[in-house]
Amino acid sequence: MWLLFAFLSALFAGLTAILAKCGIENMDSNVATAIRTIVVLIFSWVLVFVMGVQNGIFHLSGKTITFLVLSGAATGASWLCYFHALQIGDVNRVTPIDKSSTILTMILAFLFFGETVGAVQICAMVLMGAGTYLMIQKKETETGKKTKKTWLLYALLSAVFASLTSILAKVGMQDVDSNLGTAIRTAVVLVMAWVVVFATGKQKTIHGIGRKNGGFL
C-alpha cells in the first residue's frame, strides 16, 4: 500500500510543478505560495474531519508539537525557495534538483534513524545524482546560453529544506495520525508564508492577480 501512495505522491508532485509554473507567471512567488497554501490547508483539514481524527489534536505531546512545528517551518522554507526557483528558472532543471532531496533524506535517515543503506541503495543514490546532473547539463547545452545561477541556489535550498522536512516529520508523526500531522504542519506553513509576504510588502499585489493565475494556483 505504501508503494501506491508513494507513486501517487510522485504523480501529484509532478502536476504541482507544472501547475505552479503556470500560476506564478507574472506574479510574486511568495504571494503565490501563500495563496496556494490556503488551498492546501483547507483540503488537509477537510480530510482530517472526514477521517474523524480531529480530536487527536488534544492529545499531542510537547515533543510531537515541537517537531511538527519545525517540520512545518522546513516545509515553508522549501516551498518558498522552490516556487521562487520555478519562477526564475526552467521546470526541467529546477524539479530534478528539488527531487534530489531524496538522496539527502536517505543519508540523514541512515545517520539519525539507523535505517539500512545497502549496496543497492547506494547505487541508486549515485544513479539519481548522476541523472540529476546530466539533466541540468543537457538543458544548459540545448539553450546554448549562460544564465544567472540564482535559480540553482534556491533549488538547492529547496532540496535541503525538503529533506529536513522528511526527517523532522518522521519524528513528529510517530504519535499522531498522518492526516492530522499534515494539517498542523500546513497551518505553520501558512503563517510563515504570509509573514514573508507582509515582511516584503508584497500583499499589495494580491489585487492584481488574474483569473488564470488564481485558477492554476
Q: Where on the chain are the PLM-derived regions?
A:
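Juxtamembrane helix-loop boundary signature in multi-pass membrane transporters
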Residues: M1-F7, I103-V160
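Membrane-interface interhelical linkers
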Residues: M1-L11, A20-L68, A73, W79-G89, ...
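Hydrophobic core positions of alpha-helical segments in small-molecule transporters
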Residues: L8, I35-R36, L70, I97-S100, ...
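Hydrophobic/small/kink-forming positions within alpha-helical transmembrane segments
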Residues: A10, G14, I18, W45, ...
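Hydrophobic/aromatic residues within transmembrane alpha-helices
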Residues: G23, A32, A85, L111-F113, ...
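Membrane-helix interface residues
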Residues: M27, G89, E115-V117, V176-D177
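Alpha-helical transmembrane segments of compact multi-pass small-molecule transporters, enriched
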Residues: I38-F43, I97-L111, A187-M192
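Hydrophobic alpha-helical transmembrane segments in multi-pass integral membrane proteins
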Residues: S44-N55, L104-V120, V160-Q174
